[in-house]
């Protein structure tokens, strides 16, 4: 999905600032994600009864927000995405199954946000799974992130392989 809009393709560090606009305005983020979903659902080559959303980093945040919006998707997968919500009561809207794949040592996702996410899922009886990878930090699927965990973002081959496997199994169960 093109959350940012036509012609906007920010690169780090500008990408973080641009994503921050949408993290600060979840209504806008959800609207953009749902607009993309609507385009996909209307495509004649698409079976609109068999939709799922996956995303990495900010895209993972968007996938979870899509679920929180009550979107008609069977499931969402977030790879090292943000888990926080300014409105955890919106968990009541989630109809999708949720798979969150997280680096256990990710410095960009606070422990309180993980706890709140888990509580939100439990409190609203969401069908969910949270997988945490010990020794993995943010961007664990991105080879170009390097291998220096002290920078907060680094590739982790084991977490990358297993998270892909987890997603494959999740999607097989959905479809």
State where each predicted segment sits.
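Serine-hydrolase catalytic machinery in alpha/beta-hydrolase-like enzymes
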Residues: 1-45, 142-154
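Alpha/beta-hydrolase fold nucleophile elbow
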Residues: 45-56
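Short beta-strand/loop motif that positions the catalytic acidic residue
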Residues: 94, 100-102
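Gly/Ala-rich beta-loop-alpha elbow adjacent to hydrolase catalytic centers
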Residues: 55-59, 63
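C-terminal catalytic histidine-bearing segment of alpha/beta-hydrolase fold enzymes
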Residues: 122-175
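Short alpha-helix in the alpha/beta-hydrolase fold that links the catalytic acid
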Residues: 110-121, 129
């Amino acid at each position: 999905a093109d959350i940012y809009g036509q012609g906007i393709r920010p690169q780090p560090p500008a990408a973080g600032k641009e994503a921050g606009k949408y993290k600060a305005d979840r209504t806008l983020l959800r609207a953009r994600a749902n607009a993309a979903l609507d385009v996909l659902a209307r495509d004649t080559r698409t079976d609109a009864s068999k939709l799922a959303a996956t995303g990495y980093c900010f895209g993972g945040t968007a996938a979870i927000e899509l679920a929180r919006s009550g979107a008609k998707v069977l499931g969402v997968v977030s790879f090292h995405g943000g888990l926080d919500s300014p409105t955890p009561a919106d968990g009541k809207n989630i109809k999708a199954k949720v798979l969150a794949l997280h680096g256990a040592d990710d410095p960009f996702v606070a422990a309180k946000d993980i706890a709140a996410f888990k509580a939100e899922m439990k409190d609203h009886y969401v069908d969910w799974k949270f997988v945490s990878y010990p020794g993995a930090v943010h961007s664990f699927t991105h080879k170009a992130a390097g291998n220096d965990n002290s920078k907060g973002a680094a590739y982790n081959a084991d977490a990358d392989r297993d998270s892909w496997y987890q997603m494959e199994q999740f999607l097989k169960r959905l479809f």
